[in-house]
Amino acid sequence: MNAWEVNFDGLVGLTHHYAGLSFGNEASTRHRFQVSNPRLAAKQGLLKMKALADAGFPQAVIPPHERPFIPVLRQLGFSGSDEQVLEKVARQAPHWLSSVSSASPMWVANAATIAPSADTLDGKVHLTVANLNNKFHRSLEAPVTESLLKAIFNDEEKFSVHSALPQVALLGDEGAANHNRLGGHYGEPGMQLFVYGREEGNDTLPSRYPARQTREASEAVARLNQVNPQQVIFAQQNPDVIDQGVFHNDVIAVSNRQVLFCHQQAFARQSQLLANLRARVNGFMAIEVPATQVSVSDAVSTYLFNSQLLSRDDGSMVLVLPQECREHAGVWCYLNELLAADNPISELKVFDLRESMANGGGPACLRLRVVLTQEERRAVNPAVMMNDTLFNALNDWVDRYYRDRLTAADLADPQLLREGREALDVLSQLLNLGSVYPFQREGGGNG
């Protein structure tokens, strides 16, 4: 059956700031306390969405979350009106304010793990929300992510959206950022590659940075998504690269159809994994980048592998990269050699995503890949699909509500909270989502 990959990109939120919240993510740590520009960040993301949609790649948008997230501050013991809660936390424990104001939901590669209908036992598209258990600021995302996905994939005959796994370290799940799918045409059954960093009883672990994904979580997600057991491979990420800042697999590998583009040090027992994939995926091609050409350190600083690998109708592929790749002489030299070599990659598209990159999120972090048949595409909430009208409406919306300068101190401004809620109220109507945000269901909280 014919099917297409639709990229659902996260729209950057109004409180995008640099707080260094993500230990193990070196860009996040390095840019802590830098002044951010939320308006520019949102526009950079929108430009990528529109350019890819114009190039013929189906594209949609996932909206930001409510931030600062007052309900969690109340759970932490801060009381009073919403304004009083903000004032108290800013004075007594400002680190909590930064955590509950993070715009991290924009990296929707961590929103969920997807199983296309061609791979599932019941013939539905399955989406399991990620619990993002390893980081407090990200663990807050799951309930609203679930509401948003249910508002977008709202036809229960075709889509099953599953709640996140229990919030315990044993079941740490980071979503599609640790998941690849390999195969022929999108509509054919594919091989799902789940990548984990640790498992109970296995002492092969990173020592410097945490392994966020567990094998136990990956296995549970595969079960929830009803993936045919014959179409699943579980593989461990190389713990040495986690210790070099590869906090998700999509920082060191990306797949599309029959191609796996990865660093030669991406996986534990890599040669064994690639042999397994060759045996099980027709026409499988591994493009392994040698450390002699691109070091792990350079891969992390440029986000070479946090790229999007997209298929044209003729079978050729486009590699979507951040500007940092073009600015690094060694990486750009390698990429031009890649273009000249015998493989399906025939074009490089480069985007300026610096606002997101400074927090450790490149092109692949910003998108959730969902393979859909024509009938399934028609069943998706049409208001989220990118086109000229939506692009212009979202640009105007960003101009109206987003600040062009934000520091950690600004997060305590009650006006920022009000601006954010008004903006999301308007956006949820624009995207025909209904009342997906807690403040909409609670009448604006206790302000």
From Swiss-Prot:
Superkingdom assignment: Bacteria
UniProt: substrate binding residues: 19-28, 110, 137-138, 212, 250, 359
Hydrolase keyword on record: yes
The keyword Hydrolase appears for this protein: yes
UniProt entry keywords in alphabetical sequence: Arginine metabolism, Hydrolase
Family according to the record: Belongs to the succinylarginine dihydrolase family.
Name of the molecule in the record: N-succinylarginine dihydrolase
Organism listed in the record: Escherichia coli (strain ATCC 8739 / DSM 1576 / NBRC 3972 / NCIMB 8545 / WDCM 00012 / Crooks)
Lineage: Bacteria, Pseudomonadati, Pseudomonadota, Gammaproteobacteria, Enterobacterales
